[in-house]
Amino acid sequence: MDNYGSTNFNFSKRRFEHPNGENNNRKFLQISKVAYEYFWRDFDEWENKGFPTLNLSKVELAHFSENVIWVGHSTALLNHKGITVLTDPHFTGRAGPFGFMGPKRITSPPFLIEDLPKIDIILISHNHYDHLDKQTIIHLIKLQPEIKFFVPLGLSDILKSFGVKNIVELDWWQSFKHKNIIIHATQVQHWSRRSFFDRNKTLWSGWMMSWDDFSFYFAGDTGYSNDFAKTAKRCGSPTLAAIPIGAYEPREFMKAAHMNPEEAVKAFQDLNTKYAFGIHWGTFKLTLELMDEPPIRLRECLSEAGVPQRKFKCLVHGEQWGDPFGTCN
């Protein structure tokens, strides 16, 4: 195991670690109880229907510009000043190591991989199967082999095994200049694992992309911490942020790794972002809250915090949102 010279690597534990320590150790009985509840909930026909999708054609996507589209879960498509960015691309039917294993997708993507416009940059937050999907990546690079991937420390090896050649690997708070954009890897409170034997052997991160007149923050997957305030202090406040709002119950089990809507609003405020949209909900049934609860709770929390609904939106799958880009025209 290579520590990559990172100060975020715990030598005694032989793994990466957040400054707040590890919080993802769970006892067998805890896991068994949640698994039991999840198993029976999976038979709920209403929740398996998914959500409405605004389907987009290849022709429509060919003219995609100065806009963001929520594709689903943590996948978003963004364009600014001719640069098109895709986050945590996932277009397959399950989030797992095989096509028959892992949480099933309940809301279909709004378009096919083949319909995507030219992608310049892909941001990967970490190696969990609902964020790093092998079949999606393989399909993408067959169609567009020149895409540049930005990944946290340790993920380049697995991407190379998928056939990816153009990779930039960064530690927390490191940055890379791509054309006229500064791309920062930011610290977030989460963890990594892709098998039984590799817990936290690779890093996880959020991402800040900074143009001269616009910035985009992708939180990836994270619990609430002071990382958002740190990010704003180090990288500046973003124009637009993609903030996770789902997969948070049971709270005692998920709190360290996943924010609930109340915490998502706090993150919005800590970042001092102008706009945000919710991700990590409504696509895969991952945890025990009702599938439609995150956007309902988010709207309530925004009202309580005095944040206008138009500033922090829950987009429909496939919905385009151009308002944040009008601030830089």
Where do the language-model regions lie?
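Active-site HxH/HxHxD metal-binding segment of metal-dependent hydrolases
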Residues: F91-G99, T107-S175, T186-Q187
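Catalytic core of the metallo-beta-lactamase
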Residues: L77-K81, K177-P238, K255-E263
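Glycine/Thr-rich phosphate-binding loops of Rossmann-like dinucleotide-binding domains
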Residues: A95, L132, R193, R251, ...
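Metallo-beta-lactamase
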Residues: M1-K104, P109-D115, P152-F218, T239-G246, R297-E319, P324-F325, ...
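Conserved G/P- and acidic residue-centered "switch" motifs that form tight phosphate/ATP-binding loops
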Residues: D88, H126, D221
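Cap/insert and terminal regions of metallo-dependent hydrolase folds
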Residues: Y4-P19, I113-L116, I121, H128, ...
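Histidine-centered active-site/metal-ligand motif
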Residues: H73, H126-H131, H190-S192, F218, ...
